[in-house]
């Protein structure tokens, strides 16, 4: 979101924006896969019982969503994540930052919006337990990821940039 705002303001190129997206995405994917496998599957947290059942149920629900609803869900999700970041940036102290981040994140989770990086944990966790496939994961990741980009880059950074640029 910060890099897209910089791209709108021509402080960085759109090529740099895309490069940043690629690096950040793969770093988050590797971290999420590591946590899902080692702390979920290997340690056994998602290997049996209620945690296994829940992670599979959640993942199956996410991968069952068609392309357009997943895309729109991704937009809504990252719109709330972007709002959380802006509220955090504007807060004067740690308590304000916590409150500013807590409510938008709580709302997107309660609504059931999809975030590509959160899905990079929960869907592979279900894959490691036999609940869904890697193909299901990729088919979910593409629309959610694209929606997250639109939600954060256009609905947060773009709206902020253009309202400030033309509002003053």
Kindly give the residue locations of the regions a language model identified.
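Alpha-helical transmembrane segments and their helix-helix packing motifs
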Residues: 1-168
């Amino acid at each position: 979101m910060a890099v897209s705002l910089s791209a709108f303001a021509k402080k960085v190129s759109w090529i740099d924006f895309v490069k940043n997206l690629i690096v950040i995405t793969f770093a988050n994917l590797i971290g999420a896969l590591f946590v899902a496998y080692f702390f979920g599957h290997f340690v056994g947290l998602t290997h049996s019982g209620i945690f296994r059942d829940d992670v599979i149920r959640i993942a199956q629900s996410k991968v069952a969503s068609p392309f357009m609803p997943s895309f729109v869900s991704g937009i809504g999700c990252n719109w709330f994540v972007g709002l959380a970041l802006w509220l955090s940036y504007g807060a004067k102290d740690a308590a304000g930052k916590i409150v500013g981040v807590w409510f938008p994140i709580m709302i997107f989770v309660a609504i059931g919006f999809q975030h590509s990086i959160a899905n990079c944990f929960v869907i592979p966790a279900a894959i490691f337990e036999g609940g869904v496939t890697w193909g299901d994961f990729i088919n979910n990741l593409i629309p959610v990821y694209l929606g997250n980009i639109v939600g954060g880059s256009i609905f947060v950074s773009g709206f902020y940039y253009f309202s400030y640029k033309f509002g003053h």
